[in-house]
């Protein structure tokens, strides 16, 4: 009887997992949802940055950067952060290198390049450029990004900017 109960439970879990997977995003849907977000990093600030972000981020969007536990900010703060990068690294580019899809989650491996226009994170301006890796895990809801967990290798960027 115990084995039968375990089999029924396992079958139920497998069925639930398969149903959730079947309802997941396609690769095309995932790229369509994330591409506008990354394009914000690849262009000079033109037009209303807030309107652009509201088109791709849910109203309750959270950006979690992972350096401190529970360190997340909402859509309005994210708008300020992206605008700040556009000013401090005007030639910043984010190139999507790889996209993996798991249900409503989209994992993006990207490469960030740029040349700071002034001091960056306390490193004096040198005119040098950097190239770093970034990993993002995006949760998509109703075609928009609802949450982002992201890590960028800023330590490497600072090392490149300080190099002799």
Which residues does each PLM region occupy?
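Exposed beta-sheet edge and beta->alpha loop/turn motif
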Residues: 111-141
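A short, structured loop/turn motif at beta-sheet edges
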Residues: 99-107, 139-146
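Low-complexity, intrinsically disordered terminal/linker segments enriched in charged
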Residues: 23, 146-164
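A solvent-exposed, acidic/Ser-Thr-rich amphipathic alpha-helical stretch
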Residues: 50-103
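Bacterial N-terminal signal peptides that target proteins for export
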Residues: 1-8
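Short acidic-aromatic low-complexity motifs
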Residues: 24-60
């Amino acid at each position: 009887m115990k084995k039968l109960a375990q089999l029924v439970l396992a079958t139920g879990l497998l069925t639930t997992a398969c149903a959730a997977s079947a309802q997941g995003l396609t690769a095309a849907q995932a790229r369509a949802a994330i591409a506008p977000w990354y394009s914000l990093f690849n262009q000079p600030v033109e037009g209303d940055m807030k309107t652009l972000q509201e088109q791709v981020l849910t109203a309750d969007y959270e950006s979690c950067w992972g350096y401190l536990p529970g360190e997340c900010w909402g859509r309005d703060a994210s708008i300020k952060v992206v605008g700040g990068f556009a000013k401090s690294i005007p030639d910043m580019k984010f190139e999507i290198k790889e996209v993996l899809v798991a249900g409503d989650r989209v994992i993006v491996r990207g490469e960030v390049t740029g040349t700071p226009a002034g001091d960056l994170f306390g490193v004096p301006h040198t005119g040098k450029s950097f190239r770093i890796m970034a990993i993002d895990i995006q949760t998509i809801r109703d075609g928009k990004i609802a949450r982002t967990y992201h890590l960028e290798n800023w330590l490497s960027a600072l090392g490149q900017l300080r190099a002799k």
